[in-house]
Regions:
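ATP-dependent carboxylate-amine ligase catalytic core
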Residues: 1-128, 133-143, 148-182
Length: 182
């Protein structure tokens, strides 16, 4: 697997830290989750905004890190939902990021479970969890990584299987790509 996006349901800072670390250890191209659009367009016209971003992500190649969209001045924009939809539509593995400082293992486990349910509802695949600011022992069935990330984390992520769910938008993008190739 080579395409990832960080989704941090509770902390834009955790998303930024995890994204920076992933970009450093993976050494892949980055593409913005709002490439070619704005948060306002994404909130008000997602049916036209999302396909444009999917095309930009696919143009970046199979080895890419999508820099996640974050909170915006337009409060109608749900950055978590956008990032999960983009992950599903581009077959990017979701790396959940949480600020673990001062959080109990029980609370983090509940937050991870809730975020995974939300990802599943969007047809996105969670491939790992990144914790910032401490690392309580967690019992989850995906790799749990802590900052700073090293080569072992990169190898773990590269070894994950690519998501296989096919959303209507991913199917459409596949057809367009094949038509252009012919």
């Amino acid at each position: 697997m080579s395409r990832f996006i960080v989704v941090a349901p509770g902390s834009s800072e955790a998303a930024a830290l995890a994204t920076d670390e992933l970009a450093r250890v993976l050494g892949v191209a980055t593409v913005d989750a709002l490439a070619g659009t704005t948060a306002t367009d994404a909130a008000l016209r997602p049916a036209s905004a999302l396909p444009a971003v999917v095309e930009a992500v696919r143009a970046a190649g199979d080895d890419a890190l999508i820099v996640p969209a974050r909170e915006a001045s337009n409060r109608a924009f749900d950055h978590v939902a956008w990032n999960l939809s983009l992950a599903a539509s581009t077959r990017a593995g979701v790396v959940l990021a949480f600020d673990a400082e001062g959080a109990s293992a029980e609370l983090l486990s509940e937050e991870i479970a809730a975020a995974r349910l939300r990802a599943e509802a969007s047809a996105a695949s969670v491939v790992a969890v990144v914790l910032t600011g401490g690392a309580p022992a967690l019992e989850v069935d995906v790799p749990v990584l802590t900052l700073p990330l090293g080569e072992e984390a990169a190898a773990t992520l590269r070894g994950t299987e690519a998501p296989t769910a096919v959303t209507p938008l991913a199917f459409q993008a596949d057809l367009i790509e094949r038509a252009r190739a012919d």
